[in-house]
Design a protein with these regions (language model features):
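BZIP DNA-binding basic region
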Residues: 1-35
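Conserved phosphate/metal-binding and DNA-contacting active-site motifs used
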Residues: 32-183
Length: 183
């Protein structure tokens, strides 16, 4: 019999058939499954209990009704949000040092990056960027001090008191530990 993780041999004994050759392989396989489940979403975000389900851009509860996303008791772990069978997606509640730069109309007609989007990505190396729900915008994720959100010249910046729909449609790979964002 072979270990499901390392393919090493497992000694067959009486009782339940073992799947892994050791506790170390069982733990490594668990961590790998967890990492695969989060896809491209940075580990630091996936580990934060700041997720909710949503329909479109509206946070939604199990009953299908609009959710009060500002109440912590309504927040989920990433895996709970990802695996829930209601709503059509999930989002992240800003706060606790997480920030996002929300950019609209990021692509030129030829598919190249618009100058503003290119500048923001250049100024934030290591930040994780995903395409927005429309596919035309970008969310640039990182760490940010608690500050009032603002909208200016095609840029929206938020670090608390806001819900952002997450697509997981990676545009720029980021660090496992998110960097400080610059606007």
């Amino acid at each position: 019999m072979k270990c499901k993780h390392c393919n090493g041999s497992i000694e067959v004994t009486m009782g339940r058939r073992p799947t892994y050759c050791s506790g170390k392989c069982r733990q490594a396989a668990y961590r790998l499954r967890k990492e695969e489940a989060r896809g491209s979403i940075p580990k630091e975000m996936a580990e934060a209990r700041r997720w909710v389900r949503c329909d479109g851009k509206v946070p939604t509860g199990k009953d299908g009704r609009r959710l009060q996303w500002s109440k912590e008791e309504n927040w989920l772990t990433f895996m709970e949000a990802k695996n829930a069978d209601y709503g059509d997606g999930f989002g992240f509640i800003m706060g606790d040092g997480f920030g996002v730069i929300d950019l609209d109309d990021c692509f030129e007609d030829d598919g190249s990056l618009a100058p503003l989007a290119a500048r923001v990505l250049e100024e934030n190396p290591g930040a994780w960027a995903e395409r927005s729900v429309s596919g035309q915008g970008l969310h640039v994720w990182g760490r940010m001090k608690h500050a009032v959100g603002y909208r200016q010249e095609g840029i929206e910046v938020y670090s608390f008191g806001r819900f952002i729909r997450v697509t997981g449609n990676e545009f720029q790979a980021g660090e496992v530990v998110l960097p400080e964002l610059w606007v």
